């Protein structure tokens, strides 16, 4: 379960860089119709094209970026019994979920963790940490793998991309409308074209709106963790899934060696209260355990 910080940062970076580039090329001035008013239809189309482009880029590079940043060693041919068991277990679970077997890898981290990523359910990657393989019982590892297979089978990355595309579109569109209104107010002489203030306002507003809108993406991320827990319980065993989450809770103080860009993709604990809870990609482990015990979320 490990996906979103890198994803959100990539999207935000694409939006800002694209905004600067298009402003330099004069696209914003064209959309402003020489100062006579914004063409909202053209602006909305423009926003959707570039909003979904950023989301698509993030989706397409998610697997190679995850491999690189987490130093994942993919297993093509098993070199020992543990690797053979890992491949066989992922194959069994993916067959049960009705998807093509993902690539399987191990990454060097003391903390028990795992993640799944990829641009579609039949071209995914499932990776586990050395710590997970060392300290978890086989039944618990299997439950964690089932959780990750659940993410893949549920198409979480594609759904996340669609949500992010809509959010990006809103950010690009709203930032330009705000920029145009403020720029028009500041330049009451009625001169044609856009002033320098417009470009500054657009960039700053995109960053602010982008951060605020990320709470929507994170809310979906928290919801999909509950669904993946249910998938783990169905593909493996509910008691083993609960046991795995309880062990993760017990290891909360183990140093996290996973790259910051991938922390949101892992089986990490969420924040329960305060402003940080809005930006947490995962629900608190206590809530996830309770949901499984009460058989909520399916």
Curated annotation (Swiss-Prot):
Enzyme Commission number: 3.4.24.-
The record lists its disulfide bonds as none
Enzyme superclass (EC): hydrolase
Catalytic positions are: 148
List the subcellular locations: Cell inner membrane
Recorded hits in CDD domains, A to Z, give: M48B_HtpX_like
What cellular component GO annotations does this protein have?
plasma membrane
- Cofactor(s), names only, from the UniProt record: Zn(2+)
Give a GO molecular function annotation for the protein: zinc ion binding
**Pfam name, any one:** Peptidase_M48
Superkingdom assignment = Bacteria
Q: How is the cofactor bound?
A: Binds 1 zinc ion per subunit.
Concerning InterPro entries, the annotation shows: HtpX_protease (IPR050083), Pept_M48_protease_HtpX (IPR022919), Peptidase_M48 (IPR001915)
Q: Where does Zn(2+) bind?
A: 147, 151, 225
GO biological process per UniProt: proteolysis
| Alphabetic keyword roster | Cell inner membrane, Cell membrane, Hydrolase, Membrane, Metal-binding, Metalloprotease, Protease, Stress response, Transmembrane, Transmembrane helix, Zinc
Membrane spanning residue stretches:
4-24, 41-61, 162-182, 193-213
Q: Which family does it belong to?
A: Belongs to the peptidase M48B family.
Q: Which named protein is this?
A: Protease HtpX
Organism name: Alcanivorax borkumensis (strain ATCC 700651 / DSM 11573 / NCIMB 13689 / SK2)
Lineage, uppermost ranks: Bacteria, Pseudomonadati, Pseudomonadota, Gammaproteobacteria, Oceanospirillales
The gene is htpX
């Amino acid at each position: 379960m490990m996906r979103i910080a890198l994803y959100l940062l990539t999207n935000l970076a694409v939006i800002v860089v694209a905004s600067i580039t298009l402003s330099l090329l004069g696209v914003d001035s064209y959309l402003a119709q020489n100062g006579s008013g914004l063409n909202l239809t053209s602006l909305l189309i423009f926003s959707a094209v570039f909003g979904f482009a950023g989301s698509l880029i993030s989706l397409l590079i998610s697997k190679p970026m995850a491999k690189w940043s987490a130093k994942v060693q993919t297993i093509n041919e098993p070199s020992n019994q543990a690797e053979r068991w890992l491949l066989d277990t992922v194959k069994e679970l993916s067959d049960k979920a009705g998807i093509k077997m993902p690539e399987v890898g191990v990454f060097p981290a003391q903390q028990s963790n795992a993640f799944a990523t990829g641009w579609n359910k039949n071209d995914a990657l499932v990776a586990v940490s050395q710590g997970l393989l060392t300290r978890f019982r086989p039944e618990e590892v299997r439950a964690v793998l089932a959780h990750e297979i659940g993410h893949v089978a549920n198409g979480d990355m594609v759904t996340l991309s669609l949500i992010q595309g809509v959010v990006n579109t809103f950010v690009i569109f709203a930032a330009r409308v705000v920029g145009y209104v403020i720029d028009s107010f500041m330049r009451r002489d009625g001169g044609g074209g856009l002033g320098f203030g417009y470009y500054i306002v657009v960039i700053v507003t995109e960053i602010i709106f982008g951060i605020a809108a990320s709470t929507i993406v994170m809310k979906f991320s928290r919801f999909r963790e509950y669904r993946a827990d249910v998938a783990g319980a169905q593909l493996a065993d509910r008691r083993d899934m609960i046991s795995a989450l309880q062990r993760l809770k017990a290891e909360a103080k183990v140093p996290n060696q996973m790259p910051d860009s991938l922390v949101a993709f892992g089986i990490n604990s969420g924040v329960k209260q305060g402003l940080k809870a809005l930006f947490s990609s995962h629900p608190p482990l206590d809530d996830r355990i309770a949901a499984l015990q009460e058989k909520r979320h399916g």
